């Protein structure tokens, strides 16, 4: 069984949304502020899905393909 990655990185946001990696970094900062997280804490796929409105299944399918 292959384990799916739990964290989202700017490059993932770039591939999922088609936007720039810089946009991905900015969005991660916004998500951290939204969930009141510290700069050293990771953003999970569930948090990204909730914030962006993208279905979690789409995100998990992408993460399975790239893992």
Walk through the language-model features, giving the residues of each.
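Major-groove DNA-recognition helix of helix-turn-helix-type DNA-binding domains
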Residues: 18-67
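Polyanion-binding surface elements
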Residues: 4-19
